[in-house]
């Protein structure tokens, strides 16, 4: 059996860290949505008991360091699967960008393996299993727009993000998420209004969504990397209605109602930043798993 499955990137419309927990993680409230910048996974069931990864990108491991490999290994051990799999990944999501590319690939792998290994697991079961690999993966299993709490693994679905244009820009730097969280001072940063963001999404209120964006991690990443702030400022100068860093960075995204203005922001960033994308929100109903 062979199938293919889409693995969309995500952005954080709001990201709040409330306090540091006893287990070392931060208690978070994040409103996230998937976008139509996506990787594509191709899965082939093998009779031989082995996991084979083929990543069409440089600098990405094809062994146990890869979240896809970890997802496959977890399912094999949990359900005593004797079959194998070959997974080919066509990468489009930037690496180490704050867009959950690795987590989305792992989520897509879990969903694809559930099909080709005929495990019969529900989405809820896959999301629960995914939390053993990484905090962001549960959201990526569901896709669409949702509130994530706990350390990011508790997911509450929200209505789809209203239609708009999203311009992404990733500078050629890498950011360490653990380092950013370690240096975050939750008592001294401005916290986003998560309730207002949720209310605006439920009402389909784009202006309310734009006004409610916020990310507590910006205070750390922008201080360490001034180029991230320059990208954000440039987006706003070219007409973005909102601009925000996604995750721990370094990618910044702009939210814009009109195509013409979005194109202006996009053109204003090309040449200023190496990786620039113009995309739309993506909902779970668009997930085309093909056998």
Curated annotation (Swiss-Prot):
The keyword Kinase applies. Transmembrane segments: none annotated. ATP binds at residues 94-104. Coiled coil: none annotated. Its EC number is 2.7.1.148. It catalyses: 4-CDP-2-C-methyl-D-erythritol + ATP = 4-CDP-2-C-methyl-D-erythritol 2-phosphate + ADP + H(+). InterPro entries: GHMP_kinase_C_dom, GHMP_kinase_C_sf, GHMP_kinase_N_dom, IspE, Ribosomal_Su5_D2-typ_SF, Ribsml_uS5_D2-typ_fold_subgr. Pathway: Isoprenoid biosynthesis; isopentenyl diphosphate biosynthesis via DXP pathway; isopentenyl diphosphate from 1-deoxy-D-xylulose 5-phosphate: step 3/6. It is an enzyme of class 2 (transferase). One of its GO terms (molecular function) is ATP binding. Keywords: ATP-binding, Isoprene biosynthesis, Kinase, Nucleotide-binding, Transferase. The active site is at 10, 136. One of its GO terms (biological process) is terpenoid biosynthetic process. It holds the Pfam family GHMP_kinases_C. Belongs to the GHMP kinase family. IspE subfamily. Catalyzes the phosphorylation of the position 2 hydroxy group of 4-diphosphocytidyl-2C-methyl-D-erythritol. PANTHER family: 4-DIPHOSPHOCYTIDYL-2-C-METHYL-D-ERYTHRITOL KINASE, CHLOROPLASTIC. This is 4-diphosphocytidyl-2-C-methyl-D-erythritol kinase. It comes from Listeria monocytogenes serotype 4a (strain HCC23).
């Amino acid at each position: 059996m062979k199938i293919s499955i889409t693995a969309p990137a995500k952005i954080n419309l709001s990201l709040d860290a409330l306090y540091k927990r006893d287990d070392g993680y931060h208690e978070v409230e994040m409103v996230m949505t998937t976008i139509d910048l996506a990787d594509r996974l191709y899965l082939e069931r093998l009779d031989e008991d082995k996991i084979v990864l083929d990543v069409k990108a440089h600098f990405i491991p094809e062994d146990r360091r890869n979240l896809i490999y970890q997802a496959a290994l977890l399912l094999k051990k949990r359900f005593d699967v004797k079959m194998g799999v070959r997974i080919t990944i066509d990468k489009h999501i930037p690496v180490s960008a704050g867009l959950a590319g690795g987590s989305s690939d792992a989520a897509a792998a879990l969903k694809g393996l559930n099909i080709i290994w005929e495990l019969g697991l529900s989405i809820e079961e896959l999301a629960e299993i995914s939390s053993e690999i990484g905090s962001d993966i549960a959201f990526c299993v569901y896709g669409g727009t949702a509130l994530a709490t706990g350390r990011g693994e508790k997911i509450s679905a929200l209505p789809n993000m209203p239609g708009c244009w999203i311009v992404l820009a990733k500078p050629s730097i890498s950011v360490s998420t653990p380092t950013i969280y370690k240096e975050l001072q939750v008592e001294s940063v401005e916290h986003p209004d998560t309730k207002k963001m949720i209310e605006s999404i439920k009402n389909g209120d784009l202006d309310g969504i734009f006004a409610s964006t916020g990310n507590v991690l910006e205070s750390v990443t922008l201080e360490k990397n001034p180029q991230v702030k320059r990208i954000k400022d440039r987006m706003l100068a070219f007409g973005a209605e909102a601009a925000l860093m996604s995750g721990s960075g370094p990618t910044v995204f702009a939210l814009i109602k009109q195509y013409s203005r979005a194109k202006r922001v996009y053109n204003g960033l090309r040449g200023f930043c190496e990786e620039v994308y113009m995309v739309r929100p993506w909902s779970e109903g668009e997930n085309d798993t093909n056998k």
